[in-house]
Amino acid sequence: MAEAGTGFLEQLKSCIVWSWTYLWTLWFFIMLFLVYILRVPLKINDNLTTVSMFLNTLTPKFYVALTGTSSLISGLILIFEWWYFRKYGTSFIEQVSVSHLRPLLGGVDNSAPSAANAANGEADSSRQSVSECKVWRNPLNLFRGAEYNRYTWVTGREPLTYYDMNLSAQDHQTFFTCDTDHLRPADAIMQKAWRERNPQARISAAHEALELNECATAYILLAEEEATTIVEAEKLFKQALKAGEGCYRRSQQLQHHGAQYEAQHRRDTNVLVYIKRRLAMCARKLGRTREAVKMMRDLMKEFPLLSMFNIHENLLEALLELQAYADVQAVLAKYDDISLPKSATICYTAALLKARAVSDKFSPEAASRRGLSTAEMNAVEAIHRAVEFNPHVPKYLLEMKSLILPPEHILKRGDSEAIAYAFFHLQHWKRVEGALNLLHCTWEGTFRMIPYPLEKGHLFYPYPICTETADRELLPSFHEVSVYPKKELPFFILFTAGLCSFTAMLALLTHQFPELMGVFAKAFLSTLFAPLNFVMEKVESILPSSLWHQLTRI
């Protein structure tokens, strides 16, 4: 019975909502009909005549002031709307309408799910947003002391944001600490050092830890932050390697004795892999590229499961420097798999290899006459695939936007990843003759294949909408963040811009040509009310005069 009563109330409520939704037009016409019938008792005609006489007595100066004031007010609204859109990415009027006015007017989504389903949907969307905007450690991140700090000394600008450095601090605590650190004094000091915000305090803590013991993580901190050259950093990393290998061998023998020993061994493994990868990067930066490639290959064979460091991206860049394109293709064959996460490095390197086969002889004029060959079509499709994954990269490769130092963390498919890729790989594209020309001729064609407005992707998942916000947190304030897709101007900005321009033009014309504008206004009003007068005359001619007389007497 209770369920039946609830169902009846729901049906009654839906009927009332339906009546308010569809019958308001009928009530509107009924009100218009009543006003027309009561026009004599209400003296509507006399009032209209009085208003028209008053308007005829107004001078052109009044209309100039009226249109000028309207133009000023709409201009102020336009300026505020534009400022709000530039700062928050949305229209203030639209936001207020959706957030406050729509609930008051009873705007309800009839297809809204139940409360439980809505909660589940919100949870799913939040999980999707988090996964889309996951921030990754930059595999090719620079050295803080030897590169980032040198940039600050020269330019006076900070290349890293607080958000980026805070993420690095969290990474260090995850990789370089464990629950048993308090049992060893040097590791206990370093555990506090990784949480310290002041760089000098971190460096002092690392020196203090080294006075107690040969601590690998202390050497890592000094190599990253205190060393002012790559040579100094390499020396410190070699000392860290010696200490780290000893800790790794000891913990490897005890890893099966308990959960604490297993956690310690995991920490020592992370430390050892990090040191060897950074040593390989030092060798690459110092010109010993073949040595760096060997170190990276050995590291990937020794620890094949530690894919979180993305060492294959370091290997790809080093192999491109050696112009070992066959080895690059072999690495891509392993990692450019549908089941593995993609990156700009993988997609654009694959495009570079296919472009290399045809770019030296490619001519857009010849291609337009004879059509694209199979190899050229494959190269263009690879470029389109790469651009769809990260549409920000081509502007940096084509030097349409200036590069900055890459951050320590990147957002895949975002501007930060594009900067990190182009910073290291621009030289490889320039080395391949005609590759940048082919990219310049074909990359914009990608956007004709992607559905708009981006409900679904073409080869990848739809482009995430949160990249701009995350990139603004990762990139310094002096860099202009690349935004995709470009935001369209809201309707109210266009409307107020048109209203401001139109009223300003009316004010100018009324001031310069008052008589002509008066004639124009009268002609416009008479034309505007001509259909209404025609309808009224037809109604009076159709209705019987006796009925019409009785209705007007009511």
Curated annotation (Swiss-Prot):
Q: Of which family is this protein a member?
A: Belongs to the ST7 family.
Subcellular locations according to the entry: Membrane
Predominant location category = membrane
CDD domains given for it?
ST7
Q: What are the record keywords, sorted? A: Membrane, Transmembrane, Transmembrane helix
Source taxonomy lineage?
A: Eukaryota, Metazoa, Chordata, Craniata, Vertebrata
What is the protein's species of origin? Gallus gallus
Per its record, how is this protein called by name? Suppressor of tumorigenicity 7 protein homolog
State the GO CC annotations.
membrane
Membrane-spanning intervals of the chain: 15-35, 62-82, 489-509, 516-536
Coiled coil as a keyword of this entry, yes or no, is: no
Which topology term describes how it sits in the membrane? Multi-pass membrane protein
